[in-house]
Curated annotation (Swiss-Prot):
Biological processes per GO annotation: translation
Subunit structure: Part of the 30S ribosomal subunit.
Keywords: Ribonucleoprotein, Ribosomal protein
UniProt name for this protein: Small ribosomal subunit protein uS10
Pfam families for this protein: Ribosomal_S10
Annotated family: Belongs to the universal ribosomal protein uS10 family.
Ranges that cross the membrane: none
Role played: Involved in the binding of tRNA to the ribosomes.
Molecular function per GO: structural constituent of ribosome; tRNA binding
Ribonucleoprotein in keyword set: yes
Amino acid sequence: MAGQKIRIRLKAYDHEAIDASARKIVETVVRTGANVVGPVPLPTEKNVYCVIRSPHKYKDSREHFEMRTHKRLIDILDPTPKTVDALMRIDLPASVDVNIQ
């Protein structure tokens, strides 16, 4: 697999979970002998929802809720078959979305 690259994108609402997952992936890849670039923090996506507090009137009384999506990018350069096998067996939390390209 010389000259190839694996790109892993992580998404999560909890920054501690995504950082722990990224750390676990980097440790696994370094142990198998491949080169790692990252984790690179990508811009955090922030969604703000405005809701009227009262069910019928009092439009001036509103409440704001926000949802932050944290993202990280990890590039694995020159992966070996051992690296790919170790990545398939790694156990990550369900709250972290992993996209491998």
